[in-house]
Amino acid sequence: MILKKTACALALTLFAVSGVHAVDPVTVVGWGGSWDKAYKDGVWDRYTASTGIPIVQEEWGGEVAKVRAQVQAGNVTYDLVSVEVPALEIGCAEGLFVPLTPEITGDAANYLPGTLHECGVASDTWATILVYNTDVFGDAGPASWADFWDVKKFPGKRGVNAQAQYTLENALMADGVKPADMYRVLRTPEGVDRAFAMLDGLRENIVWWSSIPQAIQNLDSGEVVMSDSYNARITSEVVEEKKPYRIAWQAGFFYGSDMWAVVKGAPHEGQALDLLKWFSIPDNQAGFSKLYAYGTGRREAAQLIPADWLANLPTAPQHLQYGMPYDDAFWTENKEALEERFKAWLAK
């Protein structure tokens, strides 16, 4: 009984002490849903177990205006945010995000192209890919974007993203432009005309989509036999729903990254930088990609992911030979004009 009372007293003392020295949580802002859950289960819970620092997750839509408003008002509530690269570029230039040093991120040479930024480290790496229905084509499905455009060899409607970005790249790959040469070609008026000419040739066989659920529904209903799409959602449909879809990685693809960035003047700016330093360790980055079919920024992290699951990720070494990063600088400079031309073309 004495031992039991002593143990209880000790536990209460420790609880009281821990209460006095409680550590404030770091507020991390992501994209919600299964993405946030994968980060919680694969990364943040491990960080809390390792450091004792709790993580509070919030969801947003990536609006840099929200960060700007908080910083300008001197009332920052976000510590670490996942943000798309164009918004990161704007925020970094405006001083809304904290510049990162190699002490935080590690050696830049260890990152895939496009996954490390002056103010950010890749929170995920996704790809736009060619997917087809194996119930229709079996193992003899399209293996290139030229095949995607070949409606005689592969009859049926195609699902295509209703925006210039992503679609123009696919059109030029169908016309023989290699991913490595893409933005040299797209930077010329002749290259843009060439992409739209390819779209002219496929137009009657296109079913346009403007959201991922719509793209999946088009495949599910049989309205289209193949589509462009995002790799993680297709993997989810195949692995969890057992749907008959296959990604043709060898067709060529472009990948992009969302970025973790620390908000300037964040209430826990130092802790957020420490968290980002911890996250930059390959094993910690791999925690997310083991649960969600987006890749990592660190090259070494791929070695820590089981081979059967790694095959679903755009950053798998066997897939990267066919992939290139999106040129974010090109799209920041040209997106408005190209999207306007694309909308006018759609309306014809």
Regions from the PLM with identified roles:
Residues 319-348:
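Conserved C-terminal helix/tail region of periplasmic/extracytoplasmic solute-binding proteins
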Residues 254, 263-323:
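Mature extracytoplasmic/periplasmic domains
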